[in-house]
Amino acid sequence: MTQTNNKHYIVALDQGTTSSRAIVLDRDANVVSVAQHEFTQIYPQSGWVEHDPMEIWATQSATLVEALAQAGIDHRQVAAIGITNQRETTVIWDKQSGRPIHNAIVWQCRRSAAICEELKRDSLEEHVRERTGLVIDPYFSATKIKWVLDHVEGSRERARRGELLFGTVDSWLIWKMTQGRVHVTDFTNAARTMLFDIHALDWDARLLEALDIPREMLPQVRSSSEVYGHACIAGGDEDDGIPIAGIAGDQQAALFGHMCVEPGQGKNTYGTGCFLLMNTGAKAVRSGHGLLTTIACGPRGEVAYALEGAIFNAGSTVQWLRDELKLIDDSFDSEYFATKVQDSNGVYLVPAFTGLGAPYWDPYARGAVFGLTRGVKADHLIRAALESIAYQTCDVLDAMQRDAGERLKALRVDGGAVSNNFLMQFQADLLGTPVERPAVKEVTALGAAYLAGLATGFWSGLDELRDKARIERVFEPACSEEKRRSLSAGWKKAVLRSQRWAEDD
């Protein structure tokens, strides 16, 4: 364990889809400084998304230096670095030169759809579900790796000879920070590759063979909270470096940042869409409702399991009101207009603009508004749009609770939309469960910092961290069971009528 008596800070590196950030935190988990750099989004053709790994590295290393400078501290005062990252995004690089052989293929990229269809034709769906907890989809890293090896001449043979390395973004950053000494990932990121057996905690031989991916190129998989190596800062040597001591994929880091480390604890990140995770403890629960089974962080960063569900349209629904319908000038205005009316006047808005995600999984569903009468005003539509976010969250959480056999104790929330008090209260009313909004908004970074701090003894354990997980406001349910059932029944009827709309197109 690292000696941290004279070290008063932890740095979290938050490498996201559109920007790289560095956050300095003190012993009380207060944010001391934040530095952020956006980087280029590359769209070679429709449905393809790439990043330049060297630009990711340049922006991330720059934010680290800037955040320390802003805080007015020296790197020798930092006890550890924790890393959280966009998941699934795939980097393959030359072991000798440290240069990527191709741009990073981003999690959003759909170029490997044909490879996924091949896997389905080869009857691998059940094997993927059973071993990895995932579904066959271009979203995950496995088919992205195969695509690069298929399209960069000689790369597969070089990978077999140990000349090329694969990593998700965490692996790439650690390789660069340790000057090529360390090639690792953690269990949460490995679990999103569609190559990792989440039960045996090892790379799956059958999937590697099916995709012709050489095992030699894969990183060592470690826990989410331990010292992996040391970041060499400003040309210094390894002995002078900062311990890199925490890794978690962004959603799992947020779950840990919320201190959702016990079975039945869950969080929802309200962004463009929503990401819901519920801790299921030592039990890997197989979903009967289209949810993913994934690895989360246990109380000390060890392996725990979680159910994960994604909602496609949440904040994007409010953006639609603003940009296309011109009903509001600013997303923040939605709360004001929603509270000008007592209810939605019987209106339900189903925001299936790109189909419906969990638990319906209907790509042919389309957006619809139901219950329109002459008495419906713009305010009612705005309210119905906000309510749709809460209804969709309830659908996923109901599925999670049925799958896990666990009743949600409280829902921890983060993301841009949580500042909307109306939405948070309506969410609590629909769930019949308290909704807890944290005081610290940097929950994902907090999770990475906690993992690094635990590994180095900077923080003593969960009890100390729980004292720091301050809740700014608890939204208690204030709705009768009869009213809740009536609202939910109307929503379910609306969803049913929006389904399979585009099936014949």
Swiss-Prot record:
Q: Where does glycerol bind?
A: 87-88, 139, 250-251
Write down a Pfam family by its short name: FGGY_N
CDD domains noted in UniProt:
ASKHA_NBD_FGGY_GK
According to the UniProt entry, how is activity regulated?
Answer: Inhibited by fructose 1,6-bisphosphate (FBP).
Pathway of action? Polyol metabolism; glycerol degradation via glycerol kinase pathway; sn-glycerol 3-phosphate from glycerol: step 1/1
Q: Name one GO biological process term.
A: glycerol catabolic process
Q: Which InterPro entries match?
A: ATPase_NBD (IPR043129), Carb_kinase_FGGY (IPR000577), Carb_kinase_FGGY_CS (IPR018483), FGGY_C (IPR018485), FGGY_N (IPR018484), Glycerol_kin (IPR005999)
- Cited Gene3D superfamilies: 3.30.420.40
Query: Please, which domain of life does this record's source organism belong to?
Result: Bacteria
**GO CC annotation, single:** cytosol
UniProt keyword annotations, A-Z: ATP-binding, Glycerol metabolism, Kinase, Nucleotide-binding, Transferase
Residues annotated as binding ADP are 17, 21, 272, 315, 416, 420
Q: Enumerate the residues binding sn-glycerol 3-phosphate.
A: 17, 87-88, 139, 250
> What reaction gets catalysed by this protein?
glycerol + ATP = sn-glycerol 3-phosphate + ADP + H(+)
Question: Per UniProt, what is one GO molecular function of this protein?
Answer: ATP binding
Q: Where does ATP bind?
A: 17-19, 272, 315, 319, 416
Q: Does the keyword Kinase apply?
A: yes
Major enzyme class: transferase
Enzyme Commission designation:
2.7.1.30
Q: Which SUPFAM superfamilies match?
A: Actin-like ATPase domain (SSF53067)
Q: Identify its protein family.
A: Belongs to the FGGY kinase family.
Q: What does this protein do?
A: Key enzyme in the regulation of glycerol uptake and metabolism. Catalyzes the phosphorylation of glycerol to yield sn-glycerol 3-phosphate.
Name the chain's protein: Glycerol kinase
Q: Which organism is it from?
A: Azotobacter vinelandii (strain DJ / ATCC BAA-1303)
Tell me the lineage of the source organism: Bacteria, Pseudomonadati, Pseudomonadota, Gammaproteobacteria, Pseudomonadales
